[in-house]
Structure formats: C-alpha cells, structure tokens
From Swiss-Prot:
Toprim domain span: 79-174
GO biological process, one term: DNA recombination
Superkingdom of the organism of origin: Bacteria
One Pfam family matching this protein: RecR_ZnF
Zinc finger (C4-type): 56-71
Gene expressing this chain: recR
Coiled-coil spans in chain: none
Record's function text: May play a role in DNA repair. It seems to be involved in an RecBC-independent recombinational process of DNA repair. It may act with RecF and RecO.
Provenance organism: Arthrobacter sp. (strain FB24)
A GO molecular-function annotation: DNA binding
InterPro entries: DNA_Rcmb_RecR, Rcmb_RecR, Rcmb_RecR_Znf, TOPRIM_dom, TOPRIM_RecR
Annotated Gene3D superfamilies: 3.30.60.80, 3.40.1360.10, 6.10.250.240, RecR Domain 1
This protein's name: Recombination protein RecR
Presence of the UniProt keyword DNA repair in the record: yes
C-alpha cells in the first residue's frame, strides 16, 4: 500500500469499471511517469466530456446536442426501435451495419440485487415514444445475461398489450456476455435471426 496522493489515485482508478487493483496501480504509475503535457490533455479531455456530453432527449444516447446524430438522421427508419441497455451498445449494433432503425437506451438493466428496478430505467420514455403510433417493431437487444434477460422479459410482457411487434435478438450471442464485446458477424447474425420475444 502506498501513501498519500499515489494511493488516492490508485483507489480512484480502481473504482472504474473493469479496472482491478493491479491495473489501477499500473495506470497510476504510468500517469506519474508520463509527460505532463500528455496528462494535461487527458485531464482536459475528461473535463470536456463531462461538460459537453449529455443524453439525447429522444433516445437517451450520448450526444453533445439536444438530439443524437441517429435521431437527427432522416434516413433512419423511425418505425423500428432497438432497445439497448447502454450507449456503448448502440455503437456495438452500429458496427454491424445491419440495423437502420432508431434506438432507445434504457440506462441499465433490471437488477434487484443492485437496487435497479424498472422505475430506474428509461421505460416511461419508451412508452411515451410509442404513443404517436409510428413505431411498428421493438427489437430488444439487452445483454444475454441474467439482468438482460429479466429486462427483456419485463419489456416483452409490458409491450405485448400494446399490439406492436416485439422481437429479441437471436441466439449466437454468448449467454452471460456483454453486447459491446460481440464481433460484427455474430451480432449481425443475431439481428437477422431475431425472434418473437414471447415465444
């Protein structure tokens, strides 16, 4: 264990997702040894992203404007909405070039152990989007893990009464995996083979 500022930096870096104690230590020492100008640019980039980036008022994706570039794009099919957990999942789906509709970012998944229920997600906003009658299909593209499956089942049951086609990505994605780590071919095939979410 280190003392003072070094340990504080290691502790803070260790709070980042996917960064364990050893990685936090390596990052901290890289920062200590790096060129001060490089670190200044890093700090400025972090500050800038926290100041400028917000969430799209329609879909919840990250953007620097009121609407994200996908919601602003008139070439996107507004009748199909792909529901994902996080903004990083939008990028994963976009890499496939298989989907030309629009998105809805929930901001997470149902996880009772972590205290995340449907009311903490952007489900009300999704229902509001369905009110105009233009949406014909909802594709549920949550992660194929316990939380993602719980969220998909909840959404499918809730949307069934509305009379909109609700589909779920096909198998091919590893159970327990994260959507953002799927390769383009696997994710593309999952889109092509999507199925009714209640079957």
């Amino acid at each position: 264990m280190y003392e003072g500022a070094v340990q504080e930096l290691i502790d803070e870096l260790g709070r980042l997702p996917g960064v364990g104690p050893k990685s936090a230590q390596r990052l901290a020492f890289h920062i200590l040894e790096a060129d001060p100008q490089d670190m200044k640019r890093l700090v400025e980039a972090i500050t800038t992203v926290k100041e400028r980036v917000k969430f799209c008022t329609v879909c919840g994706n990250v953007t620097e404007q009121e609407l994200c570039n996908i919601c602003r794009d008139p070439r996107r099919d507004p009748s199909i909405i792909c529901v994902v957990e996080e903004s990083k999942d939008v990028l994963a789906v976009e890499r496939t070039r298989s989907f030309r509709g629009r998105y809805h970012v929930l901001g997470g998944a149902i996880n009772p152990i972590a205290g995340v229920g449907p009311e903490q997600l952007r489900i009300r906003e999704l229902l509001t989007r369905l009110n105009d009658g233009a949406i014909q299909e909802i594709i549920i593209a949550t992660d194929p893990n316990l939380e993602g499956e719980a969220t998909a089942t909840y959404l499918a049951r809730m949307l069934k009464s509305i009379g909109i086609t609700v589909t779920r990505l096909a198998s091919g994605l590893p159970v327990g995996g994260d959507l953002e780590y799927a390769d383009e071919v696997t994710l593309g095939r999952a889109f092509e083979g999507r199925r009714n979410a209640l079957s």
